[in-house]
Every structure is written in C-alpha cells, then in structure tokens.
Amino acid sequence: MASGGLRGLAVAGGGESSDSEDDGWEIGYLDRVSQKLKVPLPVEEKNETFKKALTTGDISLVQELLDSGISVDSSFRYGWTPLMYAASIANVELVRVLLDRGANASFDKDKQTILITACSARGSEEQILKCVELLLSRNADPNVACRRLMTPIMYAARDGHPQVVAVLVAHGAEVNTQDENGYTALTWAARQGHKNVVLKLLELGANKMLQTKDGKIPSEIAKRNKHLEIFNFLSLTLNPLEGNLKQLTKEETICKLLTTDSDKEKDHIFSSYTAFGDLEIFLHGLGLEHMTDLLKEKDITLRHLLTMRKDEFTKNGITNKDQQKILSALKELEVEEIKFGELPEVAKLEISGDEFLNFLLKLNKQCGHLITAVQNIITELPVNSHKIVLEWASPRNFTSVCEELVSNVEDLSEEVHKLKDLIQKLQNERENDPTHIPLMEEVSTWNSRILKRTAIAVCGFGFLLFICKLTVQRKYPNICF
C-alpha cells in the first residue's frame, strides 16, 4: 500500500527518545485509488491507512478516516497520538484538523507533551509558532516539564525561536524555571548562541544571574561555547532591557511582541523580531537605541565608540547624559588597574630595606600578571579572520598599539636594568665604606669571635700558671702559695 521514501522520521523533541527507532510509523507515499473509502476497512488496516495519511499530510484522507469512526486520539504503537506526530513535523493544517475533531492538546507520553514536541519540531519558526498558538488556544499548559525538567520555553530558546518564546510567555510560561542541570531558557539560548532569543528573554524578565548546577551563569556558558558577543552583552551590569515586558498583560505582550500575518493566516500571529549587530546590542543594553541612526550615519563602529575621548563625544553630538551611560558601562567592563598608590613611596630616602624589597616583589608579581594576561589573549584570539564575532577595526590599529606596547616593554626593561645597576653600585660602595655601621647580625658575630678568643687565652694562661705552680712546689716544697 506504500511506496517510496518520505523525508526523515520525526523523533521525540528535545532529545527525548522513544522506545523504537520509528515509533511504529511506516514512512512512505500513500498510493490511493479513490478519495473516498468505498469499502469499509478492517480495524488493523484502517489504522495503517490512518498512519500513512498522517505521514503524507493527506488532510482529506485523515478527515475521511475520522468520519469512518477511527478515534482522533488513537494510540499507535509506542504511545504516540496523531496530534503528537502532526506537531512533531509542524504541520499546521493537520494540527488544526485534529484539534477541531477533539484531539487532546494536553496529552503526554512519558512526560513528553505535545507542546514540547511542537516547540522542538522540524520546520520554519512561522509553522512552529502557529502550531504552538493552536495548542495554547486549547489550554495546553506551557509550564509542564519533561523528564529532564525542561519546559517548552527552554526547547524554544534552545532551538532559536524568539517568536515562540514570546508567545509562550504571553500565555503564562515561567521564564526563570530551571531544568535538572540548573539551565534556564536564557542559559540554553546563551549556550546555543541565539542572540535574538537572549534579547527577547531579557525583555521578558529573564534573570541572567541564575547559576547552573556547576555554578555557571549564562554569560559564562556563552563564553565557554565561544559566543563572545553574547558574553559581552550579558556581562554588562546596566541593562534596561531586563523586565521591560514583565508587567504587561497577556494581550499587551502579544500586541507588543507579535504582528499579524494577514497574507497567510489572519487568525494566526508571528513575531517580526529583527536581529541586531554588536553596536545595536551595546546601545540597546544601555537604553541608548536613539543613538543608533546617529552613529551609523557617521560610520562610527562599536570599537570606535568604546575608545572615544570627551571632545569626540561632543563633536559627534552625544549628550553628556548619554556619555555618562557609556562611560559607566565601560568602567564595569574594564579590568582593574594596578594600584601602585598602595606601594611605598620609594623616592623617599628614609625608606626601609624591607619596604623597598616589598615594592620590588610586588612589581615583579604585577609583571607576571601582565605576562599571563597576554598569554591568555593569544590563546583566546581566533586564528582565522572569519571566526571573529564582533566588528573589528582595521588590523593596522591593533598592530600599531602592539608596537607601542613592545616599545614600552623595552623601555621598562631598560629602566629595570638601570635600577639593578644602581642597587649593585650601592651594595659595592657600602661594603667598601669604612664608616658603614654593620647590621646587628654582623656586630653580634664579631663580638662572639672576641669572646671566644678571650676565653681561650684565659684558659691557656690559667693552665700555664698551674704547670708553673707544680714545678715550683717540687723544687721548693717549703714555699707556700
């Protein structure tokens, strides 16, 4: 009854696996003689025909079979229902027909819900969104989790569907729910590198500080997976995006986030979310969206903006208020500078030797930190230009700065050699200075030598007197001492 192959078989969404490779579905094109079922089919054959009609998306045959008495919630082998299969391939019309015939939108198989299956389906985001909307309209719960505690919004975020994320939240989905590994929808979006989803979730009140079971926050997850643009954006402390839509009603949220596609389905909606570049993301995160057109008109890149001086800000028409926001954000991102003010004032002549030694040790430690920092940069820097995520200025600028850095390092090396020679000179002069007052250790050593020599001399003199006394007594026994 079937011939030929048809695409690949849909599997359970979000990494959930069924008990069989094909879950009881035979994939193929349905070779039909007639559009009508002229002869009643046996139950077993009718079920096979129903499965093949679902597989090929034959809406009219599905309706005929339903009219013939087959159950809309038929449980095929391994437990999948017709609606679950239709949702897994994002077949909007098939989902609509089955729901209109009374299919259970809240059905689950081993905690794999139909809504989860739809959110992780194969197909365009527009198709997936329409299927999700249909299921939500039939009271499918957006907060029911699978065996791994992942909810529909996590699957939508993981697969990069900001429109689906928005409509789920509009229907009551919890944004900050965590799965068995502590991942939230934001963590999944950051892990997979879905910038648009990250922005949308922040608007919807996602908490970017929630940690996974291994203690990582979304920005760290993004960095670990080489999504540096998302890492930089999530690292910003100032983020007026966060929670912008959190207090709106469901109707207000849908109205703000989604637009109607009147050309295709007037009763279905989908988002018109636009992707941002790195400059737009930076400005958007600071609430400076109004500056976007101004900076683009003047061909100012993000790198240029981050290195502007006060006069350049003013020259390019950036107000003091906006300047302060940019500078505050930069301050948050800067690595703390070396605080040499905490070191002793080495120029003073009364400085102690211990303080000077401590200064040199701290200076050496700071140099070690600088070497490590450069080594880390070399390790993290992409080896191929096509792997660079953020917009870069001309490589000549970086080369020029590196040349200045090399020059400064050479100057530092020269100054340290001068310092070393000066210290060596002072040491030599001190050793040859007759007025030099030795340290307590040296004085005590000299005193001990004198005491030792005196003791030996006294003992020797006493022994000599004893010998002389014995000799005299033998020769002159009448002499008394």
Curated annotation (Swiss-Prot):
It is found in: Cytoplasm. Keywords: ANK repeat, Cytoplasm, Developmental protein, Differentiation, Meiosis, Phosphoprotein, Repeat, RNA-mediated gene silencing, Spermatogenesis. Residues 1-16 have a biased composition (Gly residues). One of its GO terms (cellular component) is pi-body. Residues 272-334 form the SAM domain. Transmembrane segments: none annotated. Residues 1-23 are annotated as: Disordered. ANK repeats lie at residues 45-74, 78-107, 110-144, 148-177, 181-210, 214-243. One of its GO terms (biological process) is regulatory ncRNA-mediated gene silencing. The modification Phosphoserine is found at S17, S18, S20. InterPro entries: Ankyrin_rpt (IPR002110), Ankyrin_rpt-contain_sf (IPR036770), Asz1_SAM (IPR042650), SAM (IPR001660), SAM/pointed_sf (IPR013761). Plays a central role during spermatogenesis by repressing transposable elements and preventing their mobilization, which is essential for the germline integrity. Acts via the piRNA metabolic process, which mediates the repression of transposable elements during meiosis by forming complexes composed of piRNAs and Piwi proteins and governs the methylation and subsequent repression of transposons. Its association with pi-bodies suggests a participation in the primary piRNAs metabolic process. Interacts with DDX4, PIWIL1, RANBP9 and TDRD1. This is Ankyrin repeat, SAM and basic leucine zipper domain-containing protein 1. The lineage of its organism: Eukaryota, Metazoa, Chordata, Craniata, Vertebrata. The gene is ASZ1.
